[in-house]
A protein has these predicted regions:
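C-terminal helical cap and adjacent loop that interface with cofactors, partners, or active-site loops
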Residues: 18, 296-438
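Rossmann-fold dehydrogenase core element
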Residues: 123-140, 161-164
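N-terminal glycine-/serine-/threonine-rich beta1-alpha1-beta2 phosphate-ribose binding loop
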Residues: 1-104, 122, 126-132, 393
Length: 438
């Protein structure tokens, strides 16, 4: 078998854990990592330390700047004879590597979000239209067993035509606050959490219901973070959690710290500054969650109208006692409900499992409830990560009854809703997506 030659753009924690390690350990028979590119040369050594299989393989390393990225990227593609690129860098730079990769005729795998705004998403669509390469957008949460089962039930017509979705998402104090420690807290970097985080959720809804978004309206606020956050020990900028003299006065951090140690909390989103090993040359992912530069929202409510007539009401809160969501999908013939709790603060909550399995409650419109149990999957995102990796590196499973691997149009739809949310919060208007939506 001829191996496909991959380059990784952005040696982030996500790149290492989600793509590089599996490529080296599970897919080396069909995928070959030939190059890594990053703005911080320290990330190459971090990758080697975390994935020993990378060492001694002759994998080329390319360090870029914001000014020379295109020149270095083009040289990497030519020198290493790259077939496909994995784009896992800071969100705001996705569009650069995606578009250039497509211009060079390469296949592109983009971590979500595909881009950070509608304009850049449309650039990606145009570039793909004119390229022999194709784009995959890695909305891995589709592959979660409970989410696949929901899609199956809707495709099978269990609730008839979908009329309304009610989705409330909770991001707990550990996970939620971490976004405000990192670069994600700036609109120009992440597009805002309505894109960086909620695009996951908007994609799920659109996929479940075959929905093309048309109109979006939202309200939002910065309630918990920034200088006016209720638990800010003092109004000052430039603090960092690791060496902050006010850590034990900070309600968000003192739970995980004592006067002589830090409690390590398992969290796949951020622990980089809670280790003795230096992970970055200059960037610090422990910036104060109360800094005044924060320019995104931590609470928002959203209404979306889809082309097929379905309606969505959605909310997200990034400072809750526990992690999880409540979901209800209503149709002309019935209703589906499910929920999930967990996270750093979720240990005291009622279990959403029965016999080790999560469940969906199905309510036929004129009959009694049926509880549908779904076996748990193995691996990240509820068992979704291993399955999407198989589709990426081995090709899509031909035996599935419905498409699941997200494409560029799915990225466009999810990002358009997320960007429209931020704009609607800012200007108070309903956002019309119909002129460009596919």
């Amino acid at each position: 078998m001829t191996k496909k030659r991959y380059a990784v753009c952005g040696v982030s924690a996500r790149a290492i854990g989600m793509y590089i390690r599996p490529m080296m350990q599970s897919f080396s028979h069909c995928a070959e990592l030939v190059a890594m590119l990053d703005i911080d040369p320290l990330r190459f050594q971090v990758c080697k330390d975390l994935v020993p299989e990378v060492q001694g393989k002759g994998i080329a390393e390319y360090t870029v700047t914001l000014e020379n990225w295109k020149e270095v990227f083009d040289r990497m593609i030519e020198e290493q004879k790259v077939d496909a690129v994995l784009v896992v860098c800071k969100d705001c730079h996705h569009v650069d590597y995606i578009v250039r990769g497509l211009e060079l005729g390469l296949d592109v795998i983009s971590e979500k979000p595909m881009t950070t705004n509608i304009a850049d998403a449309r650039r990606v669509i145009e570039a793909e239209d004119n390229s022999k390469g194709k784009l995959i957008c890695t909305f891995n949460y589709r592959y979660n067993p409970i989410h696949r089962k929901l899609r199956e039930l809707i495709v099978d017509g269990k609730i008839g035509r979908v009329t309304h979705v009610d989705l409330t998402w909770y991001i707990d104090i550990k996970h939620g606050s971490s976004y405000f420690n990192r670069w994600n807290r700036m609109r120009e970097n992440s597009g805002s959490l309505s894109i960086h985080k909620s695009s996951h959720h908007f994609d799920l809804v659109g996929w479940w219901i075959d929905g093309v978004p048309e109109y979006v309206h939202a309200f939002g606020a910065l309630n918990h973070y920034g200088p006016n956050g209720e638990f800010n020990p003092s109004k000052k900028d430039g603090r960092h959690c690791l060496d902050c003299p006010e850590k034990l006065k900070c309600a968000y951090k003192k739970r995980w710290a004592t006067r002589n140690s830090t409690i390590f909390v398992k969290d796949d989103h951020i622990n980089a500054y809670e280790t003795k090993v230096k992970q970055f040359s200059e960037y610090r992912p422990d910036m104060c969650i109360f800094d005044s530069e924060i320019n995104i929202y931590d609470t928002f409510v959203v209404n979306v109208k889809y082309k097929n007539g379905a309606l969505l009401n959605y909310s997200a809160n990034f400072s809750t006692p526990y992690e999880g969501y409540h979901l209800a999908i209503n149709g002309t013939r019935g209703r589906l409900e499910t929920k999930e709790f967990g996270g750093a603060g979720g240990k005291g909550l009622p279990s959403t499992n029965e016999g080790g399995m999560r469940y969906i409650d199905y309510y036929p419109i004129f009959e009694g409830r049926e509880r549908i149990h779904v076996p748990a999957g193995e691996g990240g995102h509820g068992g979704g990560d291993p399955l999407i990796l198989e589709d990426i590196f081995l090709g899509e499973d031909p035996d599935r009854k419905f498409d699941i691997l997200a494409k560029s149009v799915d990225g466009l739809r999810a990002i358009s809703v997320g960007d429209a949310v931020f704009t609607s919060i800012e200007d108070g208007q309903v956002q019309d997506l119909t002129s460009f939506m596919r």
